[in-house]
């Protein structure tokens, strides 16, 4: 099974040392400075994201990348931040289920594969919030993401 058809979840995690070989920053608009690892995507995914964002721009819509590649270690840090702030115990040792269902356990996030990209738009201040779905960009993304390989 190759990376493009691999199931990544709590039952099928990526190993802690997994890093995609062909990560790249293709230069899409991003809410992160150049050199930030979250700008990275697997090369084919990066090209698809560029085409998606350019298609949105042709319709006067602005999509901004928020988070692409995320290492196992970075995912651990995010989980610790969403657990008991008074504890320095790694998240997966405190709780078998996320406190925040949108924060995956380390190894279970598709971001570690380099195939996932979170996007937002100016109408919601480039935040990752549910109100994005009601913006013109969010509605456009629902209709068009699959045309570029995103589900």
Region spans (language model):
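Extracytoplasmic cell-surface/polysaccharide-interacting catalytic and binding patches
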Residues: 1-68, 72-151
């Amino acid at each position: 099974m190759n990376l493009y058809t691999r199931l990544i979840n709590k039952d099928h995690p990526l190993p802690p040392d997994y890093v995609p070989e062909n990560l790249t920053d293709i230069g899409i608009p991003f809410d992160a400075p150049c050199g930030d690892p979250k700008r990275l995507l697997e090369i084919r995914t990066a090209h698809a994201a560029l085409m998606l964002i350019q298609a949105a721009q042709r319709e006067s819509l602005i999509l901004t990348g928020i988070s692409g590649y995320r290492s196992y270690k970075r995912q651990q840090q995010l989980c610790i931040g969403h657990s008991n702030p008074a504890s320095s115990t790694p998240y997966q040792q405190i709780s078998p289920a996320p406190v925040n269902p949108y924060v995956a356990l380390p190894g279970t996030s598709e971001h570690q594969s380099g195939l996932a990209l979170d996007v937002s738009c100016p109408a919601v201040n480039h935040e990752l919030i549910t109100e994005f779905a009601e913006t013109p960009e969010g509605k456009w993304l629902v209709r068009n993401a699959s045309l570029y390989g995103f589900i």
